[in-house]
Amino acid sequence: MNEVFESYLTYSAGVRQFTKATIDSYKNDLIIFEEWLKELDLNIFELKASDIRIFIAELADKKIAPASINRMMSTLRGFYKYALRFNLTKMNPISSVRNLKLAQKLPVFMFPKQAQEFCRLPSNAGILWETRDAALFASLYSTGCRVSELAGLDIKDLDKTLSYAIVFGKGKKERKVFFAEFAKEYLREYLKERSDLVEKFKGQVQKDGKGKIRDTLFINQKAQPLTSRGIRYIIDRYVELSPELKHLSPHAFRHSFASTLITRGADIRVVQELLGHESVSTTQRYTHITAEQLQNLYKTAHPHS
C-alpha cells in the first residue's frame, strides 16, 4: 500500500484511537482507491473534484451501494484533512464533492413485548449458552448499547448493584447506560455461571486484540472475550428460530430501545445522551418510527379510519 496511506492509518489508530474495525474499513477503502489511481496513472495529490466524481461514477457502475460509496468518501475526506494538516498537499479535491442521496429507510425495531420475548428465547431454545445469551439480549435492549460497546464492556465498568455501566462509544467517548430490573436479573444469573467458567479455565488469561489483559463481561464457552462478530453470530442463531423477526439485525435492539423511550414520552435530548449520538438529528430518526406506530394504531383501532 502507498506509504502515505499507511502513515494515515497509523495516525488514525495511534493518535485518533479509532477501533480496529474502523481502521480495517479505512484500509479496504484506500486499497480500492489506490487501485483506481494506478489504473489511470493518477497522482493522489494532483486530483481535481472532477476526478473524484469520475471515481464515484465508476463505483456506482459496479453496483456498489450508495451507502458504501458515501462511507468511502468519508474515508477520503479524513485522509485529505490529514494530508492538509501535515502539509502533504495544498489541494483538497473532495471538499466540494457531495455525498450521494440515500433512500430514507426507517430502522427495523421490536415492540417492547417482542423484545422481552426475544430475551426469553434462549431459555426455550436449548442452543449455545442460554443464561449468557438471555443476559446479552436483555443488556442490549435495556441499555441501547452498540454491539461493539457491549463487546468492550469489562466487569470493572459495572456498578456493584448492576444499576448502570460505563461504556466507551465512538471516538472513545464515555457515557453511562442503565440496566432495567429484568436485565439485572438475567445478569445476576449469568455472572454466577461466568464466575464458575472463569475458575474452570483459570490460568488462561483473557486478552484483547492488542494483547492487553481483560476481564470482559461477556465471554465465550472457553472463558475468552466475546467479540462483536461473536455477538452478531449469537443473535443470528436465535433470529433463525423466530420467523417473524427474520429481518432483525443486531442493531435492532438499539433501535427498539430508542423507539420505546420516545413512544413513552422521553425527551429527545435525553435519548440522544443515552444513545451517545453526537447530533440530535440522528436521534430524530426514531420519531419517525413512533409516528408510523401511531398511524398504524389509528388504522387498526379507529372505527372510521
Curated annotation (Swiss-Prot):
Domain Tyr recombinase per the UniProt entry, residue ranges: 105-299
Record GO terms (molecular function): DNA binding; tyrosine-based site-specific recombinase activity
Q: Name one Pfam family in it.
A: Phage_int_SAM_1
Keywords in alphabetical order: Cell cycle, Cell division, Chromosome partition, Cytoplasm, DNA integration, DNA recombination, DNA-binding
Q: Which residue ranges does the record assign to the Core-binding (CB) domain?
A: 1-84
Mention one GO biological process in which this protein takes part, according to its record. cell division
One GO term describing the cellular component: cytoplasm
Q: Does the entry feature the keyword Coiled coil, yes or no?
A: no
> Please, which domain of life does this record's source organism belong to?
Bacteria
- Coiled coil ranges (UniProt) are none
What the record says about family reads: Belongs to the 'phage' integrase family. XerC subfamily.
Read off the PANTHER family from this record. Answer: PHAGE INTEGRASE-RELATED (PTHR30349), TYROSINE RECOMBINASE XERC (PTHR30349:SF77)
Q: What does this protein do?
A: Site-specific tyrosine recombinase, which acts by catalyzing the cutting and rejoining of the recombining DNA molecules. The XerC-XerD complex is essential to convert dimers of the bacterial chromosome into monomers to permit their segregation at cell division. It also contributes to the segregational stability of plasmids.
Q: How does it assemble?
A: Forms a cyclic heterotetrameric complex composed of two molecules of XerC and two molecules of XerD.
Q: What is this protein called?
A: Tyrosine recombinase XerC
Organism, as annotated? Treponema denticola (strain ATCC 35405 / DSM 14222 / CIP 103919 / JCM 8153 / KCTC 15104)
Name the gene.
xerC
